[in-house]
């Protein structure tokens, strides 16, 4: 009925999937106001027995075009967590102007809205990708709080290789290793897989020759550090792994270098010092909790 309110608990894919674009169009064409709050299953489920990432969708069916699409960040269950306090203090922000195809950003604060607006004004990463050239290899699955981006393969079944013009490859690999890139991934993805669309929709700022050189050197420093901190784990006959050993990255140990990357690139996107600090500290309670694993 007109002006009826409905609420659903749904998988978080509602915010982050090509296949849900049709549902988005249906809602945006018929509901004047929509609210979506999102909740992670890691490090612990926010809702007991809800062992998947979830969203709560609330909308008012008005048979008119959407005027406000309100979203929240993806909430996690941390120390001193209180569910009632969370529910009473959900922070929504209008993200109607920041929707991508099948993707509704999971943000809560005006500072995030400002940052995302600036990032989206830059050139799409997909416009730099070539059929051949210098490789950048990224993990499209795994890596809960940090993503693994290298210029070489680790023979993982969950890695994908893309190619760039030689002068851009390492600088782009550096940018993709940043806190800013992780934040963009978190807000637009299902937090399980780094899909082609989300990867290609990340934005790259204008870079002069000096900046390209700085990013190149910083990326080489970063790669050296993550390899130094990596562990080689041996498996046994009872293991579910089908290899005798595998490399386990501890990317969090390189956080100080990652922060240096953001100090360099965030001003290129037009971010202020306050906005850069927000990005560097985004979800830091969980990212540096020791639970991280990038095998």
Residue spans for each PLM region:
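Generic beta-strand/beta-sheet core signal
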Residues: 9, 39, 59-60, 139-141, ...
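Short, ligand-facing micro-motifs at secondary-structure edges
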Residues: 38, 142-153, 179-192
């Amino acid at each position: 009925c007109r002006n009826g309110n409905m609420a659903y608990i749904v998988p978080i894919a509602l915010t982050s999937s090509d296949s849900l674009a049709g549902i988005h169009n249906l809602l945006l064409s018929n509901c004047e106001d929509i609210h979506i709050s999102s909740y992670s299953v890691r490090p612990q489920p926010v809702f007991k027995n809800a062992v998947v990432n979830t969203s709560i969708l609330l909308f008012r069916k008005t048979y008119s075009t959407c005027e406000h699409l309100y979203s929240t960040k993806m909430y996690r269950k941390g120390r001193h967590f209180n569910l009632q306090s969370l529910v009473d203090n959900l922070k929504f922000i209008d993200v109607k102007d920041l929707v991508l195809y099948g993707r509704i950003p999971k943000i809560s604060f005006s500072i995030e809205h400002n940052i995302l607006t600036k990032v989206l004004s830059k050139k799409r990463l997909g416009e730099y990708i070539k059929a051949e050239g210098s490789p950048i290899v990224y993990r499209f699955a795994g890596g809960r709080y940090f993503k693994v981006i290298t210029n070489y393969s680790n023979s993982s079944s969950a890695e994908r290789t893309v190619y760039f013009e030689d002068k851009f490859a390492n600088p782009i690999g550096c940018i993709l290793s940043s806190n800013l890139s992780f934040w963009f991934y978190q807000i637009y993805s299902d937090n399980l897989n780094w899909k082609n669309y989300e990867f290609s929709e990340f934005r790259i700022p204008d870079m002069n020759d000096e900046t390209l050189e700085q990013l190149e050197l910083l990326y080489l420093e970063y790669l050296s550090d993550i390899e130094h901190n990596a562990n080689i784990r041996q498996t046994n006959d009872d293991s579910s792994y089908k290899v005798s050993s595998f490399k386990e990255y501890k990317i969090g140990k390189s956080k100080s270098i990652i922060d240096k990357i953001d100090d360099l690139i965030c001003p290129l996107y037009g971010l202020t010092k306050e906005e850069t600090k927000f990005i560097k500290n985004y979800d830091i309670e969980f990212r540096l909790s020791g639970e991280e694993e990038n095998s």
